[in-house]
Amino acid sequence: MTEYNWNERHIITFPEETLALATKDLHVYYGAKEAIKGIDMQFEKYKITALIGPSGCGKSTYLRSLNRMNDTIDIARVTGEILYQGIDVNRKDMNVYEIRKHLGMVFQRPNPFAKSIYKNITFAHERAGVKDKKVLDEIVETSLKQAALWDQVKDDLHKSAFTLSGGQQQRLCIARAISVKPDILLMDEPASALDPIATMQLEETMFELKKNYTIIIVTHNMQQAARASDYTAFFYLGNLIEYDKTRNIFQNAQCQSTNDYVSGHFG
């Protein structure tokens, strides 16, 4: 078995003016267990960044920390900085609901509301006091078009969201997330429950979305990371080992552990 130098690191950085988000010395603890170990990482605007690594490496925990989703776990504790527009959104005085408007989340399995397709999009807006039907109609159409779903559902908006296929439900969840105009979309293995055709459709949607959004995606699928992302980050045991342009990670990794992981030799 290969002995790796786990102190070896190769992590790129970006000019300040190109950043969508960054973390500094980010740690996540579940009780006494340290799940994320002091990660410094930057994300470039309007790019797709894939987080990869074996199960339990911390990539989903890291992703969930970015918009404070770990706050919902009683034993979780997050320290360090999460910098969005120069502001540390990990401060305890920050409104987590406002943070999540700017950093939207799409989960592993499609989770549409038990409502119509239309109401899935308008629910949050109506809760916020938007009553003008013309405004709501426009939000629905714009969001569904951006998620590449409008043409398939425009005549069925008042049918249950559960009548949609799995891939369509996931794109509905994307439409719901972008309807509140976030800057960043966080995706936690969004294609894991989808068939290959729906996965390709989702990736095509992501390519269109990155014109307007920064996307950070967790994936176990190496082919998906290689196809769909601009940058890839390799996590192992709570550490960020290597972070670079995707083509470099897959063709010229600087760390032996990264090279062996993406080529299927461990993990």
From Swiss-Prot:
Q: Which residues bind ATP?
A: G53, P54, S55, G56, C57, G58, K59, S60
What's in the keyword line of the UniProt record?
A: ATP-binding, Cell membrane, Membrane, Nucleotide-binding, Phosphate transport, Translocase, Transport
Per the record, the major location class is: membrane
Q: Which GO terms describe its cellular component?
A: plasma membrane
Q: Which GO terms describe its biological process?
A: phosphate ion transmembrane transport
Q: What is its EC number?
A: 7.3.2.1
Q: How does it sit in the membrane?
A: Peripheral membrane protein
Quote the catalytic activity from the record.
phosphate(out) + ATP + H2O = ADP + 2 phosphate(in) + H(+)
The membrane spanning regions, by residue number, are none
| Highest taxon above the source species | Bacteria
Q: Where in the cell is it found?
A: Cell membrane
Every copy of the ABC transporter domain together lies at 21-262
Question: Does this entry carry the keyword Translocase?
Answer: yes
Q: Name one GO molecular function term.
A: ATP hydrolysis activity
Q: Which family does it belong to?
A: Belongs to the ABC transporter superfamily. Phosphate importer (TC 3.A.1.7) family.
Q: What does this protein do?
A: Part of the ABC transporter complex PstSACB involved in phosphate import. Responsible for energy coupling to the transport system.
What quaternary structure, including any partners, is listed in this protein's UniProt entry? Answer: The complex is composed of two ATP-binding proteins (PstB), two transmembrane proteins (PstC and PstA) and a solute-binding protein (PstS).
Protein name stated in the entry: Phosphate import ATP-binding protein PstB 2
User: What's the source species for this entry?
Assistant: Streptococcus pyogenes serotype M18 (strain MGAS8232)
